[in-house]
Each structure stands twice: as C-alpha cells, then as structure tokens.
C-alpha cells in the first residue's frame, strides 16, 4: 500500500469513527468512551507527526476500519443508510466551511481555548464537551444545509446526547478537512471504491486488537 493511500484511508476512517458514533448515540443514547475520546482528541491535534498520530494510534481506528470496509463493499445496504448519509453530509458541509476563512478562524481560536480547559478538567468533562458543542452551534449550524440526525427522540432531546453529537460532527469535519488536504475527493470514492476497500481491509488486519 502506498503512503498516500494509507494516509487517505486513515483520515477517512476518522470521519467514519465520528459519524458511526453519531448514529449509535442517536439510536441508543450511548457510545464507547475510548472511541469518543479519540474523536475529541483529534480536534486538538493541529500539527500531528503523522496522519495516524491525529487519532493517537491506528489501533484506535480498528472498528472504524471495519465499519468503513462494510460501507464501501455494501453501500446500498439499508443498514448503512444513516452512516452513509452522515458521511456524505459531513463532506458537503466541510466543503462549504473551507470557503469561509473567518469561520475557520473562529473555530480554531475557540478550540484552542477548549483545549486549555480540557487540560484542566479532562478531555470529556461535561464543561469541555458543552463548549465544543457550542462552537458547532455558533458556526456550522448557521449554514443553510444542516446534517439531519435521526434516531430515538428520547435520546436526541437529552442535552448530553445533543452536545456529544455536535462534538462528533465537528470531529468528523476535522477529519474530512485532513482527508481533503491529503488529496481526497468524492470522485476518488466513486472511481476507486474497491481499491479503497482493499486498503481499508489491510489496515483493519494491521490494527485490530
């Protein structure tokens, strides 16, 4: 596997890691703490040593690689419908965001403040998550296009769940930005889906626990 394909696949798995948690939260109200921490930490990795370092380690993406492989091989499967919709929504929203330099500045500046707060309270402390969620609300939620999250109203109406979902969508957009910086595009997904599925499987075998 070439270095470029490896990095592209890792970054895209970062999108899947965050969006699959959105789907899980919306339907069950719960998520895996370690996966949530990986997604939140990725928001604070502005100058990582490598693409993999954005997520701490490739091992933290093992389940995301597995999920991405399923998505690439069975994208028409109704069971993948919500995840696929969230992934495509994130790619669309990120493309809008990249044209708004002032919004990017606001997000970056406020994430720096949230990182300082996380160093004091802990990365998944309620105050930290609430502040990051507000960044999403004050910026990306202002676009006419909004990602519609579907699930159980019982969970979606909970403040905790709503905040975690916004944080995860912001993390997904951060990974989408990284993916595009590495040369990723939607055309690539259409034309080289089988090749990407192959690389995803190789990475899953490398990093599965």
From Swiss-Prot:
The keyword Cell inner membrane applies. InterPro entries: HflD (IPR007451), HflD-like_sf (IPR035932). It is a peripheral membrane protein. Keywords: Cell inner membrane, Cell membrane, Cytoplasm, Membrane. It is found in: Cytoplasm; Cell inner membrane. GO terms for cellular component: cytoplasm; plasma membrane. Its main location: cytoplasm. Pfam families: DUF489. The keyword DNA-binding does not apply. Belongs to the HflD family. This is High frequency lysogenization protein HflD homolog. It comes from Saccharophagus degradans (strain 2-40 / ATCC 43961 / DSM 17024). The gene is hflD.
